[in-house]
């Protein structure tokens, strides 16, 4: 697995340039941290890399495939936990997971017993509505949803927000 990000550009209107040539490469097994001041475009870059925001220019290739030309690349290769909670608040944790597990071919019930949901402590909260969960539990559930399709690439925006330090250090 190899990711090539080249000259990503994004602006809002004519005067607000958010990204002006972001570039990097990443190989399988590498961790990349995007660091910068508030408002410098970190979240914008991550949203573009996850396929939820369109870039004005540049290229993103995953294993040589142009992700901007084929939106299915994002679905196949990338799991994304955005900064803002992506969960369906009025549904239970279980129903949120079911939504993300559909069409994956994976056994959600087996994962609940010994997979990521069990490791992150989500399994005991499955029947609670998301709007009744703590911020930390919502973040854990969001991570489980992003990992439902077992993507080779996981993008986390503000990964430690709402999580206690011990859980933040667990390597999945």
Predicted features by range, described:
Residues 154-158:
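Catalytic Walker B motif of ABC-type/P-loop ATPase nucleotide-binding domains
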Residues 170-172:
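Conserved small/polar residues in nucleotide/adenosyl-binding loops
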Residues 98, 108-125:
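Conserved ABC ATPase "signature" region
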């Amino acid at each position: 697995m190899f990711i090539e990000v080249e000259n990503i550009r994004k602006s809002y209107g004519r005067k607000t340039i958010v990204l002006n040539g972001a570039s990097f490469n990443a190989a399988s097994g590498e961790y990349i941290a995007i660091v910068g001041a508030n408002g410098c475009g970190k979240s914008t870059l991550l949203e573009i890399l996850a396929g939820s925001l369109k870039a004005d220019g540049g290229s993103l290739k995953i294993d040589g495939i142009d992700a901007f030309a084929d939106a299915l690349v994002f679905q196949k290769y990338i799991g994304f936990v955005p900064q803002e909670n992506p969960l369906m608040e009025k549904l239970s944790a279980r129903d949120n997971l079911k939504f993300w597990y559909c069409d994956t071919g994976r056994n959600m019930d087996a994962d609940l017993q010994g997979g990521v949901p069990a490791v992150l402590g989500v399994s005991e909260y499955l029947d609670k509505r998301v709007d009744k969960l703590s911020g930390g539990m919502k973040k854990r559930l969001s991570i489980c949803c992003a990992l439902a399709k077992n993507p080779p690439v996981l993008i986390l925006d503000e990964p430690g927000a709402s999580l206690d330090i011990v859980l933040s250090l667990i390597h999945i």
